[in-house]
Design a protein with these regions (language model features):
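Auxiliary Fe-S-binding modules of radical SAM enzymes
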Residues: 2-168
Length: 168
C-alpha cells in the first residue's frame, strides 16, 4: 500500500517460511556448538506462516531480540501460564470480555483464551482478529494494528465488560 515507486517485494508464503526456518535452524546448531549460544532467532511470524509450533521459551536464551518481536509470543505464552497458576481454583464469574489481535496471532490467542475459560467457569472471551486495512492485509501482526482499524471493525459489536487490545 505504501510502496509505490519502490522495489517490488512479495509476501512470505508457507514454503518461504519453512525454508527460512531450516536455514535459521542450521545456523543455530552451528553457533550453539561453536559459541554456546544460538545467536540468531527466527521471527514468530515465520513459525506461524510455516504452521510450525513456536520454540519453547528456553530456546530464546533470555530473549535478546524481544524488542524486535522475536520470541514475543513464546514469552507471552509463558507469562500467561504463570498468571493462570496465580488464579487458584474456585473462581467463577459471569463476565464477558473481548480480545482484539492481529490475524497472525489469532489462533494462538484463542488457545490461551480457551485455557482461561476452562479455569474460570462462567468467563466468556471473544477473540476478534483485526484485519490491517491501514497498512494492507498482508501486515497481520498485532503490533501494527491501528486505532482506526480497531474502531472500524469493532464498531457495533457486543464486546462485553471489557476490551483487551495488544500492547505491542
Amino acid at each position: 500500500k505504501f510502496r509505490k515507486g519502490l522495489y517490488p517485494l512479495r509476501a512470505v508464503d508457507k514454503h518461504d517460511a519453512e525454508e527460512a526456518l531450516k536455514t535459521v535452524s542450521r545456523w543455530q546448531d552451528a553457533f550453539l556448538q561453536r559459541y554456546g549460544s544460538r545467536i540468531v532467532y527466527a521471527a514468530d511470524e515465520l513459525y506461524l506462516k510455516a504452521g510450525q509450533p513456536l520454540p519453547p521459551p528456553e530456546a530464546y536464551e533470555n530473549f535478546p531480540q524481544l524488542e524486535n518481536g522475536i520470541g514475543m509470543m513464546a514469552l507471552f505464552g509463558q507469562q500467561f501460564q504463570q498468571g493462570l497458576k496465580g488464579l487458584g481454583t474456585g473462581r467463577q464469574t459471569s463476565r464477558r470480555v473481548s480480545v482484539a489481535t492481529g490475524t497472525a496471532a489469532c489462533r494462538f490467542i484463542e488457545s490461551l483464551v480457551r485455557t482461561v475459560e476452562e479455569k474460570v467457569p462462567g468467563l466468556k472471551v471473544q477473540v476478534f482478529p483485526i484485519t490491517n486495512n491501514f497498512f494492507g492485509q498482508t501486515i497481520d501482526v498485532a503490533g501494527l494494528i491501528t486505532g482506526g482499524d480497531l474502531m472500524e471493525q469493532l464498531q457495533g459489536k457486543d464486546l462485553g465488560a471489557r476490551l483487551i487490545i495488544p500492547r505491542s
